Amino acid sequence: MGQTALAGGSSSTPTPQALYPDLSCPEGLEELLSAPPPDLGAQRRHGWNPKDCSENIEVKEGGLYFERRPVAQSTDGARGKRGYSRGLHAWEISWPLEQRGTHAVVGVATALAPLQTDHYAALLGSNSESWGWDIGRGKLYHQSKGPGAPQYPAGTQGEQLEVPERLLVVLDMEEGTLGYAIGGTYLGPAFRGLKGRTLYPAVSAVWGQCQVRIRYLGERRAEPHSLLHLSRLCVRHNLGDTRLGQVSALPLPPAMKRYLLYQ
């Protein structure tokens, strides 16, 4: 068995699941992704911060995306508006393949991580204040200058995974892990030992005029759930994405059908 397939994940991008070990996703992630996404106001509250980015980056649409100005020999980063120290959080990064260049790094950072340097580099993950995945090279960076950085996910045959335009970042501050998912498949923890910090969504980029979007998908706190809530998760899991449209045909009261569909 390969990585964990997520309910609600897109299957448009195939992943070589047989190459990687069996890695279970964080508790509550499937539930988080099955729930209705936050509204536009919440998206902007969790979006890119125009006051916390490189001077070569312009944040647009209230934080929904940024554009990097075409400045030579500069690596530029941006941080999200909200930092997370508790709970499970997930957000989607959209970054066109043709706009990545030599160093396109996605991850998290503390408020102290630098957001600009005067050369091309994997800025995110270059010191102790940030953690990042170079989605072009497939390398993980933390306190790293590049050489010897581990590959992610760690394939058994040395094959590098092609990262599509959209990927999920999964930050579990209850367990202290950071991981990623693509094509509806969770790839496993990339980093551990993150408890006790406040971490912000972050990226660093080198491509002139690249546009990087962020879409916050929600939060789940570690707390007991009601039997009704757990029953809904069980029913949705057994139906699967392809059969959720058949809820209306189930022998259930209308109110229960609406509850199953988060309506």
From Swiss-Prot:
One of its GO terms (biological process) is protein ubiquitination. It holds the Pfam family SPRY. Keywords: Cytoplasm, Host-virus interaction, Ubl conjugation pathway. GO terms for cellular component: cytosol; SCF ubiquitin ligase complex. Disulfide bonds: none annotated. GO terms for molecular function: ubiquitin-like ligase-substrate adaptor activity. It is found in: Cytoplasm; Cytoplasm, Cytosol. Pathway: Protein modification; protein ubiquitination. InterPro entries: B30.2/SPRY, B30.2/SPRY_sf, ConA-like_dom_sf, FBXO45-Fsn/SPSB_families, SOCS_box, SOCS_box-like_dom_sf, SPRY_dom, SSB2_SOCS. Residues 1-16 have a biased composition (Polar residues). Coiled coil: none annotated. Its main location: cytoplasm. Residues 26-221 form the B30.2/SPRY domain. Residues 1-48 are annotated as: Disordered. Residues 222-263 form the SOCS box domain. The SOCS box domain mediates the interaction with the Elongin BC complex, an adapter module in different E3 ubiquitin ligase complexes. Essential for its ability to link NOS2 and the ECS E3 ubiquitin ligase complex components ELOC and CUL5. Belongs to the SPSB family. Substrate recognition component of a SCF-like ECS (Elongin BC-CUL2/5-SOCS-box protein) E3 ubiquitin-protein ligase complex which mediates the ubiquitination and subsequent proteasomal degradation of target proteins. Negatively regulates nitric oxide (NO) production and limits cellular toxicity in activated macrophages by mediating the ubiquitination and proteasomal degradation of NOS2. Acts as a bridge which links NOS2 with the ECS E3 ubiquitin ligase complex components ELOC and CUL5. Component of the probable ECS(SPSB2) E3 ubiquitin-protein ligase complex which contains CUL5, RNF7/RBX2, Elongin BC complex and SPSB2. Interacts with CUL5, RNF7, ELOB and ELOC. Interacts with MET. Interacts (via B30.2/SPRY domain) with PAWR; this interaction occurs in association with the Elongin BC complex. Interacts with NOS2. (Microbial infection) Interacts (via C-terminus) with HCV envelope glycoprotein E1. Interacts (via C-terminus) with HCV non-structural protein 5A; this interaction targets NS5A for ubiquitination and degradation. This is SPRY domain-containing SOCS box protein 2. It comes from Homo sapiens (Human).
